[in-house]
Curated annotation (Swiss-Prot):
Pfam families: NadA
Protein name: Quinolinate synthase
Catalytic activity, EC: 2.5.1.72
Enzyme class: transferase
GN (gene name): nadA
Natural source organism: Clostridium acetobutylicum (strain ATCC 824 / DSM 792 / JCM 1419 / IAM 19013 / LMG 5710 / NBRC 13948 / NRRL B-527 / VKM B-1787 / 2291 / W)
Protein purpose: Catalyzes the condensation of iminoaspartate with dihydroxyacetone phosphate to form quinolinate.
Database matches in HAMAP family: NadA_type2 (MF_00568)
Length: 303
């Protein structure tokens, strides 16, 4: 069944000059049929630079929105319309406008995990792979950072010379992990290196041997010569690409770290989206132009 469906998807993709982008947190079978698998930053670049007519974005809504902002001439499809991001929903344009009024000299840096309405009010976006670099490069000593307070506190540690005003948002999957979860895994499986995403809260980050984005974690594990066992403290979907890229090492996920929104997309959704061109992302042009500035600044500052 799955193999037949995959073949039909690949044929539809060819017929429609479409590409399938999948985030590392997607289901393994979805990653298998993707043209490109990556983190938010790399997928944003691909969406902008690729010459396909249609982008099928297997991720969550803010990712598909970002692709449409960067590539308005392309048809952008989100196969599963219920795939939202609770953290992105924690930041609203009205609240951000009020915070900007309280801090008129601050520059606003939004994690790409935000709505297009929030991006329209920001000076630049960032991802977990380039947040510290962008905050360091932006021409202001005062920064409003949203929506993730954990990533923001990590950036504050990396860029102590800046005054960072944190929004009170978080990723539910990463924020729920506590130090005892790490200790239990080490007691069960023995000594191993800990790879943690910066969306984790500080007590967990402090236990990590390496802190980085999903892509950076895979790169680190591939190049590291000091260990062959790793505890991977991020969403479990990363295991598919991590084990493929580094088959000679052992990776232990935290089984509780499952994002139901990232796992909402199934092969059937991708097939139906290609057949019926559903569900297409449309953004009002004035709003798109405002959001475009923050995403383009991210691509420039994040180089």
């Amino acid at each position: 069944m799955d193999q037949n469906l995959k073949e039909q998807i690949l044929e539809l993709k060819r017929q429609k000059n479409a590409i399938i982008l999948a985030h590392y947190y997607q289901r393994p079978e979805v990653q298998e049929i993707a043209d490109f698998i990556g983190d938010s930053y790399n997928l944003s670049k691909i969406a902008k630079e690729n010459d396909a007519d249609t982008i099928v974005f297997c991720g969550v809504k803010f990712m598909a929105e970002s692709a449409k902002v960067l590539s308005p001439q392309k048809k952008v499809l989100l196969p599963q319309p219920k795939a939202g991001c609770p953290m992105a929903d924690m930041a609203d344009a009205e609240g951000l406008a009020a915070l900007k009024a309280k801090h008129p000299n601050a520059k606003v840096v939004s994690y790409i995990n935000s709505s297009v309405e929030v991006k329209a009010l920001c000076d630049t976006c960032c991802t977990s792979s380039n947040a510290a670099k962008i905050v360091k490069r932006i021409d202001s000593d005062e920064i409003i950072f949203l929506p993730d307070k954990n990533l923001g506190s990590y950036v504050q540690e990396m860029v102590p010379e800046k005054n960072i005003i944190l929004w009170d948002g978080f990723c539910k999957v990463h924020n729920m992990i506590i130090p005892t979860d790490i200790e239990e895994m080490k007691n069960k499986y023995g000594d191993m290196k800990i790879l943690a995403h910066p969306e984790c809260w500080k007590p967990v980050r402090d236990m990590a041997d390496f802190i980085g984005s999903t892509g950076a974690m895979i790169d680190y594990a591939e190049k590291d010569t000091t260990s062959d066992k790793y505890l991977v403290v991020t969403e479990t979907g990363i295991m598919y690409k991590m084990q493929e890229r580094v088959p000679n090492k052992t990776f232990y996920p935290l089984r509780s770290m499952v994002c139901v929104n990232m796992k909402a997309t199934h092969l059937e959704d991708v097939y139906n989206s290609l057949v019926n061109s559903t569900f297409e992302i449309n953004i009002e042009e004035n709003l798109r132009q405002k959001a475009l500035t923050s995403l383009e600044n991210m691509l420039i500052l994040g180089r």
